[in-house]
């Protein structure tokens, strides 16, 4: 690359997408700066999203496990922990992650600049620094990886101390007894699990007719039943008319005429890209109504020297995919093309209690496509390992072509689902006839393990053939 600019490339944002791009660029010898608006690297994933919510979930699930373990069932008092204590656990994990990621940049001599970036022209950024000064930076190319934030409708007062979004909920300073969660997407369902696991009353307001409609319907139904069985009140096909903050909580008026009151509200209905402060109009770029940018297969925007990755380009909005997008964009930026691409079947992990994970097609999709598939199932309660550790709730379902035996989709509900799914994913990615359900029958698994569910499910499915 010519060295007429301050940098070969500037990456805006240090979340998974920005990190993947920055590391990919410096490994190829590029002079790179990463701009981060906050004091610490890691982006929303590390500080407000994936890491803290999963740390909260882990702490709560351990409390549930203790309270339900028959070894301790004769104790007269249940184990409890305050929300503040659980948040402390999340903070410890965040600090570890931040130090580790800061080390990545330092070891690779990648410069970190703090401040808010905005485009001045096609190759120039103005950096508004924390001390009020403004620096001018130039680069031949750019990667926009500035992530997303919770969507804030204008008629909801997020300055009220009892109205939270998925970022501010991590700063809650009171102990809720009853929480309203508006939005039953992934974030809403995960926090419904967390709060209910802490014995907090939960009303989950779903604007659609079922939970997580993109999932295989059996997985969605399993989650709905588990929520119902644990005491979560789910209200489908509802939208708010008005949200009132009051001294002792929040009142929500629904368009159906219902009124709900709780100690606090978590508004978790949508996200928007952090692009509004970038002055993209100065380089001829436009976003959609959600602040997202359109890109091609190499993650180039309408300006060929400007790339975008992660939440700021929308689907799949996963930290795992964002890192790979950044790595691919780095290859394309330096070499003009990339020899890697995102896999077609990206696994989905949803960290409710229990977890849900899936990869490939659902039964509903295969039926609509008129694919002759069969189903193999394994119930966790029949696995020795699950009985030993007390994880009896759950199932693994394998969908496979009844003629070729090719695995078409895998869906798992239960503890460790997000880990278990990768065994099947590895086989699904095999080429030249390697993707076959018969692999699980012909393979010897460690015993007792949760992975054995694949053998049980494979035998169950193959026994259905005639």
Swiss-Prot record:
Keyword Oxidoreductase: yes
Compartments it resides in: Cytoplasm
Cofactor: record remark: Binds 1 FAD per subunit.
GO biological process: one example: NADP metabolic process
Main location: cytoplasm
InterPro entries reported in the protein's UniProt record: Class-I_Pyr_Nuc-Dis_Oxidored (IPR050151), FAD/NAD-bd_sf (IPR036188), FAD/NAD-binding_dom (IPR023753), FAD/NAD-linked_Rdtase_dimer_sf (IPR016156), Pyr_nuc-diS_OxRdtase (IPR001100), Pyr_nucl-diS_OxRdtase_dimer (IPR004099), STH_gammaproteobact (IPR022962)
Cofactor: FAD
PANTHER family in alphabetical order: DISULFIDE OXIDOREDUCTASE (PTHR22912), SOLUBLE PYRIDINE NUCLEOTIDE TRANSHYDROGENASE (PTHR22912:SF93)
Protein name, entry field: Soluble pyridine nucleotide transhydrogenase
Organism (species): Escherichia coli O81 (strain ED1a)
């Amino acid at each position: 690359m010519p060295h007429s600019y301050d940098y070969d490339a500037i990456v805006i944002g240090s979340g998974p997408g920005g990190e993947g791009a920055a590391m990919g660029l410096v490994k190829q010898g590029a002079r790179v700066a990463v701009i981060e608006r906050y004091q610490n690297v890691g982006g929303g994933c590390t500080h407000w999203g994936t890491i803290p919510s999963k740390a909260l979930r882990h702490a709560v699930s351990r409390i549930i496990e203790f309270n339900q373990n028959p070894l301790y069932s004769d104790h007269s008092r249940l184990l409890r922990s305050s929300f503040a204590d659980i948040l402390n656990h999340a903070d410890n994990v965040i600090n570890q992650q931040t130090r580790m990621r800061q080390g990545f940049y330092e070891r690779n001599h990648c410069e970190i600049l703090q401040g808010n970036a905005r485009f001045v022209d096609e190759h120039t950024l103005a950096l508004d620094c924390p001390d009020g000064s403004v620096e001018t930076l130039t680069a031949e190319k750019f990667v926009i990886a500035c992530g997303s934030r919770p969507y804030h409708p204008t008629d909801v007062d997020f300055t009220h101390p009892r109205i939270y979004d998925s970022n501010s909920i991590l700063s809650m300073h009171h102990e809720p007894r009853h929480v309203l969660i508006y939005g039953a997407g992934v974030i809403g369902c995960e926090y419904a699990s967390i709060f209910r696991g802490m014995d907090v009353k939960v009303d989950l307001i779903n604007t659609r007719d079922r939970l997580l409609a993109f999932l295989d319907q059996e997985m969605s139904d399993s989650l709905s039943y588990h929520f119902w069985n644990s005491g979560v009140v789910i209200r489908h096909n509802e939208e708010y008319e008005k949200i009132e903050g009051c001294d002792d909580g929040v009142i929500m008026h629904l368009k159906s005429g219902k009124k709900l009151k709780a100690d606090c509200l978590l508004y978790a209905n949508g996200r928007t890209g952090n692009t509004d402060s970038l002055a993209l109009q100065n380089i001829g770029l436009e976003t959609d109504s959600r602040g997202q940018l359109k890109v091609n297969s190499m993650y180039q925007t309408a300006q060929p020297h400007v790339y975008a990755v992660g939440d700021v380009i929308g689907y799949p909005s996963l930290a795992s995919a964002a890192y790979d997008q950044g790595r691919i964009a780095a290859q394309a930026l330096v070499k003009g093309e990339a020899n890697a691409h995102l896999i077609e079947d990206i696994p989905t992990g949803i960290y409710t209690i229990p977890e849900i994970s899936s990869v490939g097609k659902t039964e509903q999709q295969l039926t609509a496509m008129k694919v002759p598939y069969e189903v193999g199932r394994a119930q966790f309660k029949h696995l020795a390992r699950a009985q030993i550790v007390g994880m009896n709730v759950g199932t693994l379902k394998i969908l496979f072509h009844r003629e070729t035996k090719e695995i078409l989709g895998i869906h798992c509900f239960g503890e460790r689902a997000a880990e278990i799914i990768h065994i099947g994913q590895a086989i699904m990615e095999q080429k030249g006839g390697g993707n076959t359900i018969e692999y699980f029958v012909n393979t010897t698994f460690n015993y007792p393990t949760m992975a054995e569910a694949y053998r049980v499910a494979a035998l169950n499915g193959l026994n259905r053939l005639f």
